[in-house]
């Protein structure tokens, strides 16, 4: 027995249910692209019953060895969660370069986290950077950490507190 009629019927049924989906399940998507010899940009938006999201990206170069790029995005969930990020990087003709970035997340039940930092290299090759991170659980426990690097030395500090603000031991990851 041939499976072709069954597959055609299944495809038709799938298409028919997609056409008649109620508005709450409708999906939307848009995309815009621009390009030139020196750079460009892309922007994308999506929306459906589960989430809404946006993201953007840009880049630019001058033909002399200097270039930069950036990207960002965000997401909002139907149940209250949200997240986002923002990053950029550059490179100069003299050999210096760097990058910066930040990100956040907010849970629907009260937890949240955020991080930000950057790293740079000067024309002589010296590298410096820092990053800080905070996270708070729905129960109020909080982690705060920072990392720095300079002259080849890496330093990390961290602290944890409970909802009352009392110091507690920071949990170790697996």
Task: Please place each PLM-identified region on the residue numbering.
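Low-complexity repeat regions of mature extracellularly deployed or surface/particle-associated proteins
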Residues: 24-174
